[in-house]
């Protein structure tokens, strides 16, 4: 990469990454989910993922989670990766402790560390398999002690609602059972606003396409906490 290419990358704005037309489209989709709930999520999943679902099919059932399988090689790699991420996050957690000082008689200031009450994890799917994202997001939440962890993952495109088994295996390993199959931006809206099936969460995290990024940016306007706009690899590959 030459100096001119690097200069272009460093000067990219939100308009370059997420065009205004796409943000407008995503904003309309979010409003639809806010107003119509499950029906809008199902419509978006049918329109953008080619998968027709009923509202009662949005949540992945316990039998589907239990029956998910990957090859022995992949399974062993996931176990190893989860162990590494868990050990790192446990070390970080153990280094964090509450503290306070008395700045004047009767007045104390300090910090207290506690998990948020709920977290929504968006795991990309569709054309590729991203179990790595599932454990990179899920392990910190589990180690932190977040009481409720909800996962949204798009179903395999043009199928009958199947979800990447690698993601389900990771969730099973982590004890995460609240998993929803839904279009990315619509699923993020559902996690933020809540629907008839999906309860809202306090924070939404997870990487994705420009449409997913736009959804997270737009949700911040409704007071929903989301992750940073883009990870470095997303900025390069978009």
Model-predicted segments: where are they?
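Conserved active-site and cofactor/substrate-binding residues in soluble primary-metabolism enzymes
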Residues: 17, 21-24, 28, 36-39, ...
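Short acidic/polar active-site loop segments enriched in Thr and Asp
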Residues: 37, 147, 177
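Alpha-helical recognition segments enriched in aromatics with Gly/Pro capping
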Residues: 149, 155-172, 181-193, 203
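Conserved NAD(P)+-binding/catalytic subdomain of aldehyde/semialdehyde dehydrogenases
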Residues: 175-238
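Conserved small-residue-rich beta-alpha loop and adjacent elements
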Residues: 99-169
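N-terminal Rossmann-like NAD(P)+-binding subdomain of aldehyde/semialdehyde dehydrogenases
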Residues: 1-110, 114
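Active-site-proximal helix-loop elements at catalytic-domain edges
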Residues: 1-10, 163-179
